[in-house]
Amino acid sequence: MLSKALNINGETGLLAVIGDPVSHSLSPKMHNLALRHCQLNYCYVALPVKPHNLVRAVQGFAAMGMRGFNATIPHKENLLPLMHTLSEEASHIGAVNTVVIDDDGKMTGHNTDAYGFITGLKEAWRSDLSGLTAIMLGSGGAARAILYGLIQAKAARVIIANRTIERAQALIEAMQPYAPNTQLMVAPTQADQLPLESCDLLINTTSMGLKGETIPYIDLARLPHHAFVSDIVYGAHPTPLLRATAQHQLGGQDGLPMLIHQGAKAFELWTGHSMPVELVEHTLRQ
């Protein structure tokens, strides 16, 4: 049985997640559970950091000897120029969500979001994602990481459906150099413009569903029976999209596995230990 109390002392290391806002984050619960399980003397906290304070905050983290931190909205892109080194994923995606600080205060920026999405998807659906056709709704920061992950997994075709065609096109232009074998396309958010019949994987990267709203231009009845639906929104109850997915007897998952697996990768980068993923997911879903 894990103790619920953190044993903080003079040698306790500090880890954190920064954002604005950040009080809703599940990361402290996830990481502190894993730290206790692995008997590691760290504490993970959520720190609200306004955009105009980002540079000072990051400099302070290095000065005080923090081991590292996560970043969420709105800081992922703005961390790029503050890093001493970037991982290949962070450089290609154009965003940092995990920072490792060495003993000299040097910071390496990583992006574990693509890994988190692909790992969760493989566990829930199928281990080989090569050759698939995916339709992705949205072109924001999460979409950028997920698209990179699909390219690395050798998807054959990814269609980005977005209300603003120009934003989707800009995302494709940014990712095209890394996608020699993946066809990237743009489609408007109109039912008759989406080739759902040939879709293997439907991904919602937008916030639609967070407040219980449906996605009007998606007719799940048009998907083939083998298709899988991934909605990166997560909460106490399934989104309307995932409820409809179950009604159509399709496979699907919410965004919690992505959150957990990106966190597990960050945890390993900081500590060298593996996160107890099953324990964490069971706890977060209670």
Swiss-Prot record:
GO BP annotation list: amino acid biosynthetic process; aromatic amino acid family biosynthetic process; chorismate biosynthetic process; shikimate metabolic process
Entry keywords, A to Z: Amino-acid biosynthesis, Aromatic amino acid biosynthesis, NADP, Oxidoreductase
Keyword Mitochondrion part of the UniProt annotation: no
Chain positions recorded as shikimate binding sites: S25, L26, S27, T72, N97, D113, Y234
Location of the active site: K76
Pathway(s): Metabolic intermediate biosynthesis; chorismate biosynthesis; chorismate from D-erythrose 4-phosphate and phosphoenolpyruvate: step 4/7
Superkingdom assignment: Bacteria
Keyword NADP: yes
Cellular component aspect of the GO annotation: cytosol
Binding site for NADP(+): E88, G138, S139, G140, G141, A142, N162, R163, T164, I165, E166, R167, I232, G255
Regions that span the bilayer: none
Principal EC category: oxidoreductase
Catalytic activity: shikimate + NADP(+) = 3-dehydroshikimate + NADPH + H(+)
One MF term in the entry's GO annotations: NADP binding
Pfam families attached to this UniProt entry: SDH_C, Shikimate_DH, Shikimate_dh_N
EC number: 1.1.1.25
Assembly and oligomerization: Homodimer.
Similarity section: Belongs to the shikimate dehydrogenase family.
Function: Involved in the biosynthesis of the chorismate, which leads to the biosynthesis of aromatic amino acids. Catalyzes the reversible NADPH linked reduction of 3-dehydroshikimate (DHSA) to yield shikimate (SA).
Protein name: Shikimate dehydrogenase (NADP(+))
Organism: Magnetococcus marinus (strain ATCC BAA-1437 / JCM 17883 / MC-1)
